[in-house]
Each structure stands twice: as C-alpha cells, then as structure tokens.
Amino acid sequence: MLRRIALLPLAAAALVVCGPNPKSRELRLWSDNYAFYITMDPMPPRALEPITYRVVVQDKKTRQPIETGEGRIFATSADRANTSDGFKKEKELGTYSGRLFFATTGDWAAAIQFRRDKDPRLPLERVDWIQTVHTASEPGT
C-alpha cells in the first residue's frame, strides 16, 4: 500500500510531462514573406471575455524574428460585429500581442496585417483564418 502511495507523485509528474503540447495549440500561418506563430489566452476563446493573442513573426526565408514591425489583428462575425487591436511589442524577440473581445459565439473571420517596418510605403501582408468562439463561461467560474 505504501508503495502505491509513493508512486502517486511519479504518476502525476508523468501526466504533466505527457500532457498536451503547447505547440499543438499554436496556429501557424504564412504570408509571402513572414511566418506567424499565434497563441491565444484563454484557449479556447469564449464570447464576452477579452482574448490575448501572442504572435511571433519571423522572416519566412531566414527564420529570423522581425523586431521593428507593426501590425494589427481583427475579426468580423457573420452578423457583422467587429473587433480589432493594434499590435504591442513584447519583450521576447519578434513577439507582438493584441487583445480581441468577441461579442457573440460562432465562427469569426479573423486576420492579421503586418509589415516589417513602420514605413507606410511598405505593403501590409495579410493572413486570414476562421476563429471559432465558444459560449461564455458561467459567472464565477
């Protein structure tokens, strides 16, 4: 009996190590010149809660992080509700963040626009995806 109790912490540690890989929840998108690695918190996104998107941007060919870029994240629902935010530079190399607030559940057409420098003459590159938004959490949970 004591042997089984002693093995419980090892079993719990094994579950943590073998748990879901954070990379498996990462959305990966590519434009002509950039690779975007997108995570969101909380996951899955829920209506009526602010969702923070963290976006790592790399040069598609060299895999180097893009440090001086600018961009935005935005989404539109089927009933034309909109949400958007400009990117804020984070401490990590090539990492930006933006927050979206989804007013309704369902599928939203989401997109990122981004350019390497803050030069308005440079074109904005765009990637699109469908973001499924789940029902809001119950109050107090």
Language model features: what each stretch is:
Residues 1-16:
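Sec-dependent bacterial lipoprotein signal peptides
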Residues 18-141:
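N-terminal soluble domains immediately following signal/targeting peptides that reside
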